[in-house]
């Protein structure tokens, strides 16, 4: 079976290519970074497609499945950039699937759609506000999901995966920011770090996406994916820095004040059309200050998903790699 992976040169994409090829799939890796595409070709014997999502709709490639992992995933930026990447890009992928008579499209979305100014536990896939306008990323990912549902209704079998808090070797977002903060100003600790969160080893997300390709469950469904190990934020930090071999440094801050400050900052940035990410955003405050855990029962039943790497194993693997690189 032949799978096209969009965004293959990104963090998740590399692990996804490895997961598919190690399980016997023929893979075409799509992306714009030709150097990384060449590395994927050399390391995993994949086909490569060097193009942007703007151009993909016109491509004619005989593939059985598409996993759409490409997205503009950040908390700040220009509306048109988010729209072009996450909405228009998704429509272009849908058009590619129709042109090439693809059997199934697996779309990578985000559990950021669940974010609210309150603790939320055991969230099921349907428990989200489809009018969530916290940031452009969430708005455009919701719009992309609407396109996926429409395509499914029109005859293209589609599945949506919402993976939470990906981390692993090669991560440039979650853990590197925590490590940097710990070594400089200290890690912001809101609500004493008692908020319970789900984070996910990227290897487990790649597994879930392969299972979504293989599953014979009804199309049109959405699945949460996590490690299935809800944990207090402070406990995750303590385990991480024990493995790294550093003392954890905290900066205790009040949630309410930070939310107010972040709202003001965002307002100023919007007023003056500043597109560089603010030092603090509402999304960051809500993520660090409130509990959010996801229910993955549906993925376990329909996809037969069971995480293959525990949270502790993933943290140790990341910490060992960080220490090895810093010694060199």
Predicted regions and their residues:
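N-terminal Rossmann NAD(P)H-binding glycine-rich loop of SDR-like oxidoreductase domains
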Residues: 1-23
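NAD(P)H-binding glycine-rich loop region in Rossmannoid oxidoreductase-like domains
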Residues: 49-88, 96-99, 116
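Conserved Rossmann-fold NAD(P)-dependent oxidoreductase catalytic core, especially the SDR/UDP-sugar
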Residues: 92-136
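Catalytic helix-loop patch of NAD(P)-dependent Rossmann-fold dehydrogenases
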Residues: 119-166, 187
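Substrate-positioning beta->alpha
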Residues: 143-144, 171-177, 190-213, 220-221
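Conserved C-terminal active-site "lid" loop/helix of NAD(P)H-dependent oxidoreductases
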Residues: 202, 261-270, 274-304
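Mid/C-terminal beta-alpha module of Rossmann-like enzyme folds, strongest
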Residues: 211, 215-278, 312, 316-319
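Amphipathic terminal alpha-helices
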Residues: 294-302, 306-328
